[in-house]
């Protein structure tokens, strides 16, 4: 199997979650072995999507360096990882990725418009060789070896609308689009009011998030899935794990995970070469994992 990029340049415009202003997003093809590269056109700064460039994980995944940063990259990265795209250049004219509808489906549609192009180099993957776990109290994220990669996620909120939810997602492109990509981000009204008082989340609305008060969902259309909340957590994890630089072939298991724990997991996996193996997807290995990329 070969590495991929997009076939043609595409662009869109969307609102930024925090500033509430229009942002121009452009996706461009990139050569083999270049990975995922972000570029801020407004300040002329580039950042490679990798764990070392993560600078904040409090409310979103933020990458950057001394020249600047780009916030809320996880939904776009999730779509890119879900589509198995290895190399792509992402250009934005602001310090955040547009929120679109709060899910990854708009980015999937943009990738469909761009098309997928195979390159000459073999596709690299990260095979999980040992269990790796990062925990904080009862919360944890872990990855374990598996020939049938899946995301097994449980969330637990002391809230009547959410409660405890678990979803197991067997990874493949087709299932990603059907089961995960449309799940929207969610937030509590009391938190939104606090953030907007700090001039943050100014672009948040019922058009780009599931909003919850003390007892109800505020969106008139309701949920897209009965368990949309936990599905969105999987969406985030698919995006955060893309920072490893290649598809992770192993199970991801989480209880009450977060962007911060996901980031710490990527660092922990890469910290010891006994934890993983970088391999080219071919021969018997390709046969084992073919359906992941279907």
UniProtKB/Swiss-Prot annotation:
Protein's UniProt name: UDP-3-O-acyl-N-acetylglucosamine deacetylase
Cofactor(s) recorded in Swiss-Prot or TrEMBL: Zn(2+)
Record's GO cellular component terms: membrane
UniProt catalytic activity: a UDP-3-O-[(3R)-3-hydroxyacyl]-N-acetyl-alpha-D-glucosamine + H2O = a UDP-3-O-[(3R)-3-hydroxyacyl]-alpha-D-glucosamine + acetate
Family label: Belongs to the LpxC family.
Pathway in which this enzyme or protein is active: Glycolipid biosynthesis; lipid IV(A) biosynthesis; lipid IV(A) from (3R)-3-hydroxytetradecanoyl-[acyl-carrier-protein] and UDP-N-acetyl-alpha-D-glucosamine: step 2/6
PANTHER family given in the database record: UDP-3-O-ACYL-N-ACETYLGLUCOSAMINE DEACETYLASE 1, MITOCHONDRIAL-RELATED
Species whose genome carries this gene: Campylobacter curvus (strain 525.92)
Keywords for this protein: Hydrolase, Lipid A biosynthesis, Lipid biosynthesis, Lipid metabolism, Metal-binding, Zinc
Class of enzymatic activity (EC top level): hydrolase
Highest taxon above the source species: Bacteria
